Amino acid sequence: MTQYNVTGMSCAACSARVEKAVSKVPGVTSCSVSLLTNSMGVEGTASDKAIISAVQKAGYGASKKGGSKAAESADESALRDTETPKLKKRLFWSVGFLIILMYFSMGHMMWGWPLPSFYNSNHVAMGLTQLLLTVIIMVINQKFFISGFKSLWHRAPNMDTLVALGSTAAFVYSTYALFMMTDAQTRGDMQAVNTYMMDFYFESAAMILTLITVGKTLEARSKGKTTDALKSLMKLAPKSAVILKDGEEKTVPIDTVQKDDIFLVRPGESIPADGVIIEGESAVDESALTGESIPVDKAAGDKVSAATVNRSGFLKCRAIHVGEDTTLSQIIKMVSDAAATKAPIAKIADKVSGIFVPAVIIIAVITTVIWLLLGHGVGYALARGISVLVISCPCALGLATPVAIMVGSGLGAKNGILFKTAASLEETGRIQIVALDKTGTITKGEPRVTDIIPNGETTENELLKAAASLEKKSEHPLAKAVISYAESKNIICDDVSIFKALPGNGLSGTVNGKNIFAGNLNFIKTKAEISPGIKEIAERLSGDGKTPLFFALDGKLLGIIAVADVIKDDSPKAVKELRNMGIRVVMLTGDNERTANAIGKSAGVDEVIAGVLPSGKEEAIKKLKKLGKVAMVGDGINDAPALTIADIGLAIGAGTDVAIDAADVVLMKSRLSDVPAAIRLSRATLRNIHENLFWAFFYNTIGIPIAAGVFIPLGLTLNPMLGAAAMSLSSFCVVTNALRLNLFKLRDASHDHKIKNHLKNVTEESKAMEKTIKIEGMMCGHCEAAVKKALEELPEVESAEVSHVSGTAKVTLKDEIDNDVLKKAVEDKDYKVIGIE
């Protein structure tokens, strides 16, 4: 996606106009414009020149975001709030001159404030003073007129057009009244003079501009806060690094650091690039990236990330990712891209915004004409029309979704949860089923010793010493678990000679002149006597999802060491939270059914799908999708296809780059508890968007009829000044409501809302969609092929597995089918159907 800066946009109608114009450029496949960040993301083959030209023809300015992506991402000045200071300055002078104008126009009438003697009975001077003060305020706020009339000229009216038309109408009519009053005074018609003076709307013309500026200032300030999370991430990027070159330490700008450079980090300093530690040990604070407050111990060989803080020791590292490739830059890019994309829910507001302003102008004209036809004066009718113009606010509609998306994605980034697009932030909250890969997601992904059971007089240390001595020669993952545990207990291993690895059985060797063996039950019972009690223990361990390793020395059983891929500490709690949210939790694993069920029971999942090969995960997700919206959580290369095909793919942060690229949501910390937190945040963001859209639609639906005077018979009316005040506050209310998301607690499960799904198990569903046909008469492979073809030609049949050896055809169905139809298809090929199950 190519990013562009867009200038001149003031409301949702502007962004809709730009998006429409660029989407028509040949070669553009998608275009998304963000009013919040004044940016545009374009995909396709169209040239920069063609895209920029289309934006300019629409009446706006555009430029490609220059420089390297790394520099662009690292420079927080791109998001600095430059609009608020300008608006504050405009507001200061506008309010100053408005106070003087209000003093002359209303002070003497409403509060009896004295006027300079020069103005006594000098109505023309009074009118001219009001005109001049209004002109000054209009010049101060000329941006409304330049933008508004320019957009009108390009046949793309926006919010500024409504303000400009409303203020201009009030000013022009007041100027006309001033000329007519001057003529009446020249003729000595004082009654006409007083009548025309009452038709002055100079203060309304000025008040509209000032109040809209108040609203714009509040809105700009609030919008600036929505990007605080992104700006705080950008500020984390170190500005310099200390590198080691030719034996000398040099402090260099961060953008000059190259891959494979050696850099040094002292205690208290930020790590400048992603790298691997060559020398040194330290505790590194990774809270900025993962949200984890406890520093992580690091030593030689461990990886470190840019913007994390070295808390204790001295580190010497080699850079492996620099500039735009660092973890920090990738996080910033993901958050920026999420803000640049549009959530599906925003399409409604976009469609309305595109026709909103022209519709309001038409309503204002009709309103004015109707009041004139009802016999009211021009001033009264014009006031109703102006009220319609200035109360209508497309900005509230346009901001309803993007501000919530920006705040939500920023809050997620602060907590180590990265949503790649606005759509993923919206859809995550609608998930009904969560499929969890077992290894590395529910479990820690590395086998560990869970039980040590010595036999007879053998002690734990004796068993562990013998086991570690033999396993030290093995490369098997289970062997590493035993060795690691022995090292943690400071066990000193003996030397082993004549070592042999016996595939499918175990290990053998000689230690201190004695024969030692390790392996499964079938192997060890040929080397030593196994009591029924030991067999029962092994059976129980297997039932708990653990692998029992037997060890024997010179014909005597030493004992059992159980090894298992242990469940992460937070997995059961995370699964429980998901279930409490009304989400069905399914575990996918390649383990056998017995082991898988044991782990699934410990984790607390609803359903276990065992024996799933890496290539079969994709098929399992397809079946789950028939039951509801599915999220897949995984961390490995073999999870990538399943992550892609799921409605939402969530990659655990410690996983591979392939898995992270395939996912819609990245969990920076390898915590399963971040899955319910991500769903919780998505639901809160979606709820906030609904609130914003409701307010925006409700405000305009109620406000426009009131301004038009529909409720005047009930005594409810609205003058242009109150209309402008309401308009100025509408966008501010929407943005402020979105900022409330910053107070949301992602990990607070006490307010989780349970959604009733009533979903079947996929295993139950699969059984319901399978039938086994018992057939007589099949003799060879040709018979199998004939029956298979006959069955698969039926539209309700997805696939058929036929065996002449067992005399069966196992049929997988797409839809319900009568047994008689299946029977006829087989018997038409001259075979006999005995039964169908």
Predicted regions and their residues:
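Flexible metal-binding regulatory segments at protein termini and peripheral loops
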Residues: 1-125, 248-251, 333-341, 745-837
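Juxtamembrane coupling segments of multi-pass membrane pumps/enzymes
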Residues: 2, 181, 190-192, 206-267, ...
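Conserved ATP-binding TGD loop and adjacent catalytic N/P-domain core of P-type ATPases
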Residues: 16, 29, 267, 321, ...
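Conserved cytosolic catalytic loops of P-type ATPases
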Residues: 26-43, 48-49, 53, 200, ...
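Transmembrane helix-loop-helix hairpins at the membrane interface
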Residues: 86-240, 351, 720
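Membrane-embedded alpha-helical bundles of multi-pass transporters
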Residues: 110-124, 153, 172, 411, ...
